[in-house]
Amino acid sequence: MYRLTKGDDYILLIVYVDDLLYIGSTDNVTTWFEGELQKDLTLTVSSIVTQYLGLNIQEEEGTIYLNAAKYADTIAKRFALTPTTISTPYRYTAGNDKAKSAPLKPAGIRNYQRKLGCLLFAAVTCRPDLSYSASQLATYLKRPEAEHMAELDRALHYLVNTPTIGLIYYKNITTTPKLIGYVDADHAGDPDNRRSRTGYIYRLEPIGPISWQSSKQELIALSSTEAEYIALCSATKEGLYLRELLEEAKLAQLSSFSLFCNNQSAIRIANKNGFANRTKHIALRYFFVKDEIEKGRLELSYCPTSEMAADYLTKKLGKLKFEYCILLTGQSHVTSSDTPEAKGSVGNN
């Protein structure tokens, strides 16, 4: 994102190849900016944006809806995906057993990589509910097996069969925005190397979700508390970045941000008297989070696991908990006249 200032006015600009998306603080600066561009470029200007990079954008009074319905329809045609009835992007089992199946041949590997790229795009743009699956499947990008391809196909079927799930944002807000994050970790959940997984999501309240991530931790966590604290450090860094970005873009002036964690031991470690011999090897992370709390830029609070919005970013969940997390994070079923009909239905699988 770029920011251009002209006096007291400014333009926020996003560029992808030859597609520009911009907004001005006033109509005058927007008109001036378009005039400057048209001096050197031939532009097709649309004052009402309904699509951008395959995403549907629907604006109504007080709300903006974002989904990947058109993109999902394209994926269905590209990979000839047939209708199915599923409610999650993965097969839920009590444990994450290591896959044991035949490795794919070179042609299969290339197909796996193409499909995964499509899934990743949806996951990072407007489908946080796909983030865990996309991140986990990316682990096998170079040497996927038949079991991984089956899981990838299921995730794509889920995307195609739930095209109206997207993000909802509220505009014309009169209250002061607040940056609120939720962070979670799954200890030693990877069946291949027992690495833990970090998941976090940030919402600009009461507007909507603005950032999320599901990623494997670089360190081997020796306990669930340690895994949660490593995740807490990653989420704190993202919160600081978002706070500065919002201020620079003049979208919000925030003195601090809030972060909710469901591990009370990790919260105690972040406080003044939480450091101990068993946490010496994560000392830098400890002092980083502790310093942000003492400076008043981070407000760390407890959230029960039952209300942890980031839970579906770290592990496989059953149908009911998975759908509840979708609601907690601010995702919604978004429908419009331009939304292709679902190729199937969500069921109990």
Which residue stretches match the model-derived regions?
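Catalytic palm subdomain of template-directed nucleic-acid polymerases
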Residues: 4-41, 56-67, 139-146, 265-278
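Structured nucleic-acid-interacting core domains from mobile-element enzymes and related host factors
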Residues: 157-185, 253
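RNase H-like nuclease fold core
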Residues: 119, 181-225
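Mobile genetic element proteins and their domesticated derivatives, centered on retroelements
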Residues: 1, 18-20, 33, 37, ...
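RNase H-like nuclease module associated with reverse transcription
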Residues: 140, 178, 218-349
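Short, conserved non-catalytic motifs in the polymerase core
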Residues: 1-5, 10-17, 95-116, 180, ...
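C-terminal reverse transcriptase regions that engage the nucleic-acid substrate
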Residues: 47-167, 304, 313
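Active-site palm subdomain of RNA-directed nucleic acid polymerases
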Residues: 1-17, 21, 29-31, 40-49, ...
